A protein has these predicted regions:
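Hydrophobic ligand-binding cavity/cleft-lining segments
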Residues: 1-45, 99, 145
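Residue-level detector of alpha-helix boundaries and kinks
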Residues: 2, 12, 52, 79, ...
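A short acidic/glycine-rich loop-to-helix N-cap element
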Residues: 108-131
Length: 145
């Protein structure tokens, strides 16, 4: 399965970036790639279920995911429950480094079309990488505003 890792450095402070990153329902107000996000259920142990609709390379991609928000490590882990891909799991992480605040995203996915995987996986991998960089850059810019 393809695995994507992105690393985006931003000028805003780590706490401000973390606050913006986990505020997923605000994404559509300042990101053109995110059409809608809704937190369906929030549990007291840091888990929540959300539904997403995003534009990926001109196509609409929709899914529901379970997320684990870990305040101590500033990580937001996710695993698709159902949706357009067979597998979509990963993690966003916010860290303070000497060059600024770093937003790292790692994801593994399977588009679920074995016969076309060789042709589609590289395209999907690039589209996912580009979208994640756009999201991280927008989060960093909003946190810095």
């Amino acid at each position: 399965m393809p695995h994507v890792i992105t690393r985006t450095v931003c000028a805003a402070g780590v706490d401000a970036v973390w606050a913006k990153l986990k505020d997923i329902e605000s994404y559509p107000t300042y990101m053109t790639v995110v059409r809608s996000v809704e937190i369906e259920r929030e549990l007291s142990d840091g888990r929540r279920v959300s539904s997403w609709s995003v534009l990926l390379k001109g196509s609409v991609l929709e899914w529901r995911e379970e997320e684990v928000v870990d305040e101590a490590s500033r990580t937001l882990s996710f695993a698709q429950l159902d949706g357009d891909m067979d597998v979509f799991t990963g993690q966003w992480r916010v860290t303070a480094e000497s060059g600024g605040t770093v937003i790292t995203m790692e994801a593994t996915f399977d588009i679920g079309i074995p016969l076309l995987a060789e042709m589609l996986n590289p395209v999907a991998e690039k589209a996912l990488r580009d979208s994640c960089v756009q999201i991280a850059s927008a989060v960093g810019a909003q946190a810095h505003a």
